[in-house]
């Protein structure tokens, strides 16, 4: 039985908003992987660690945050889809205890969103950004190997997205 929910999307802010609503709806705890990383690595955040320690060390520390989630119960996680590249083996382990919800848009819309997306620092962009080839690769991996639910959110409002996600959860667990 899957004990947690995880929301993955290229729109991190939307994923975070949805995850908070799901946590409230199902009386679960909410966790943001990036906030967990920052908390466990005070005084450094992702950007400052990348500057001071380099990409490899930062990715190793990000992996440790994902690894922690294996021990959680009754929680909703929001994860940056960029972590899938560095932690695909861990995400496959998380799949056993997490109902993974993949929110996606039509490819053309996602490419436009990625081009327009702004990052707080160049370091965040280096860690979490995607080009068109990487977008398609991640989309294939997440959709075929990780996701329990795939919801096309192109043109949907937040309320419609919530309804679609809750319907997919109910369908998965075969409840009304």
Question: How does the language model describe each region?
Answer:
Residues 24-63:
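Conserved substrate/cofactor phosphate-moiety recognition/catalytic segment
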Residues 164-175:
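C-terminal alpha-helix
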Residues 94-117:
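Conserved phosphate-donor/acceptor-positioning beta-strand/loop module used by diverse small-molecule
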Residues 5-23:
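Glycine-rich phosphate-binding P-loop
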Residues 2-5, 73-74:
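Pre-Walker A (Motif I) flank of P-loop NTPase domains
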Residues 81-84, 106-108, 156:
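Short glycine-rich anion-binding loops that position phosphate/pyrophosphate groups of nucleotides
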Residues 57-97:
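Glycine-rich phosphate-binding loop used to anchor ATP phosphates in small-molecule kinases
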Residues 60, 120-164:
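Small-molecule kinase domains that catalyze NTP-dependent phosphoryl transfer to phosphate-bearing small molecules
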